[in-house]
Amino acid sequence: STSEIAIIDKENKEINIQSDNIIICTGSEPVSIPGIEFDEEKIISSTGALSLKSVPKKMIVVGGGYIGLEMGSVWSRLGSEVHVIEFLDHITPGMDKEISLEFMKILKKQGIKFNMQHKVETIKKSNSGAVVSTVDKDGNKNNFDCDVVLISVGRKPNTEGLNLESTGIELDEKKRIKTDKIFKTNVHNIFAIGDVIEGPMLAHKAEDEGIAVAENIAGQSGHVNYDTIPGVVYTSPEVATIGKTEEQLKQANTNYKIGKFSFMANSRAKAIDDAEGFVKILADEKTDKVLGAHIIGPQAGELIAEIGIAMEFGASSEDIARTCHAHPTFSEAVKEAALSVDKRAIHS
């Protein structure tokens, strides 16, 4: 039935629940490399990386995306020798390239080692840990020994085992549930949100979608502005991004202008000796409307919210620049970057 779900409780009893509307939000799980299984001891997922019993002497992270770098950064700061193996020539695919390059430079200074343009062929467990075999861009074969290998190459939606086929719900080629603009599936009373539908697998995206779908079911006009959903890498320093990247604007032939401001010139960052990184704001060349922003540095995940509000209300970089920011705060770097869009930064 499309109006009833069956669940198994902790006592292994089946419970049937009826409802006029059903929302599927079963999340996602880590994926591995084909032919390689997680044992969560020597070959681990991001879930296993949260519960290691001791600090590994050497950890290899397969994948240079958000989650792999977050986990690698944590274990590096705890004392592990961390090596990142990435198939592409840069980390954090999809991120503004200038930020990505600065990010890798900072992580290298912290001692994390990077092996770029390496394709993983096999991962085999050994007595002491595991051996990762790769082929680099020149066709050379390489073997990397480690105590633990963290595979962080993506996640997949949890849509298997739900008996969705009995309802006729349509999935796409990535096993995500197809929905319309109000999160409704092809079945009139079943909706889906979060990691099981298209879009970035982010908790705050799912939360906003959950609110929107509840509003829609209640007869209101819930919606999510996907252009203003931030992404944050919780490393040290943090990295945050929202809106368009410079590469996306170039590809779309959009005329834009750039404002940048370094935390080296921010008094709060200097005072706490955490002044690496910068704020980058992209604005439309003609209208000055903020199109995107990218931050690497202290409290980047907090600072990006200001840009999100500005973009939600269609603000210009001048609107941000004319807003008084308290001194001394990290947020002054955002104001200065906005001033820099028109080459008016004060402390650059």
What are these regions (language model features)?
Residues 50-51, 56-60, 66-142, 199-207, ...:
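Rossmann-like dinucleotide-binding cores of NAD(P)H-dependent redox enzymes
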Residues 29-31, 114, 170-172, 220-228, ...:
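A short alpha-helix-loop-beta-strand transition element characteristic
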Residues 2, 26, 45-47, 116-118, ...:
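Short loop/edge segments at beta-strand edges and connector loops
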Residues 235-245, 250-348:
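Flexible, glycine-rich terminal cap/loop adjacent to redox cofactors
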Residues 39-55, 142-218, 223:
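FAD-site-proximal beta/loop scaffold in flavoenzymes
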Residues 26-81, 85, 113, 165-167, ...:
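Glycine-rich dinucleotide-binding loop and its adjacent helix/turn
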Residues 2-42:
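Glycine/serine-rich phosphate-binding loop and adjoining beta1-alpha1 elements at the start
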